[in-house]
Amino acid sequence: MSVVGKQLNPVQSSGAGAVTTSSSAAAGSSSSNSGVEANGGSGGSSGAAAAGAGASGDAKRPAESSSVTPDEVLHLTKITDDYLCSANANVFEIDFTRFKIRDLESGAVLFEIAKPPSEQYPEGLSSDETMLAAAEKLSLDDTADPNAGRYVRYQFTPAFLNLKTVGATVEFTVGSQPLNNFRMIERHFFRDRLLKTFDFEFGFCFPFSKNTVEHIYEFPNLPPDLVAEMISSPFETRSDSFYFVGNRLVMHNKADYAYDGGNIV
């Protein structure tokens, strides 16, 4: 099995109590040897998000509309044109530091990426020291692209589309505020066709905590003609990941996917 990863946009993570959740897909993938490459991108245009979704399924909404609800994103009929919230909406300082994908049938790790230790806050800091470190980091990042880290590009071999059940482990840290009803809704499209929706509950997370959760992705079989089209159309398979705390949208990340086993773009 060939597994290749390239870290350009480190995913964010950390560790503590581990939780496993599962969700069924509206369409998906299935079984053994897969290679995967991941590229970080710039995440689209800078500044506050300028597009969103209404209950009608429209994928555009003014950036100042900060009341995007879970029900609205569940009714989207296409990938969003831009981010539905600004990077500054993450007032809970949720920071993903590690991400791993594994085939649950074979146990094979298909992909793993982590933020370098130098970019993670060391353990054992007091709350004041942690807040000071965060403030120093923000001052260094003032001129950076506000959407950096919100977009990632993956390249898989065609075999990935044969996988039936995949475990995605994410590790993350939380800032000074607790997370109540932390939830992720992930929508996958091929062009304007909805492939699958995943809806995961993280539950409650303590302030200044490190957390590990594994989401179980259960994929039904895709029609052979659709699989062939997805393989021949790299990066036309895309996803939106929406993160809510107490039904308030606090993070929106994007990704696109290729299944042709090609080189990193």
UniProtKB/Swiss-Prot annotation:
GO cellular component: a single term: cilium
SUPFAM superfamilies with a match to the protein in the record: E set domains
Keyword annotations: Lipid-binding, Protein transport, Transport
Entries under Pfam families matching the protein: GMP_PDE_delta (PF05351)
Listed Low complexity bias regions: 13-37, 47-57
Recorded GO MF terms: lipid binding
Keyword Transcription regulation included in the entry's annotation: no
GO-annotated biological processes: cilium assembly; lipoprotein transport; nervous system development
Binding site for tetradecanoate: Y154
Stretches for region Disordered: 1-69
Record-linked InterPro entries: Ig_E-set (IPR014756), PDE6D_unc-119_myristoyl-bd (IPR051519), PDED_dom (IPR008015), PDED_dom_sf (IPR037036)
Domain of life: Eukaryota
Tissue specificity of this protein: Expressed in nervous system.
Family from the record: Belongs to the PDE6D/unc-119 family.
Domain notes from UniProt: Adopts an immunoglobulin-like beta-sandwich fold forming a hydrophobic cavity that capture N-terminally myristoylated target peptides. Phe residues within the hydrophobic beta sandwich are required for myristate binding.
Reported function: Myristoyl-binding protein that acts as a cargo adapter: specifically binds the myristoyl moiety of a subset of N-terminally myristoylated proteins and is required for their localization.
Protein name: Protein unc-119 homolog
Organism: Drosophila melanogaster (Fruit fly)
Gene name tied to this protein: unc-119
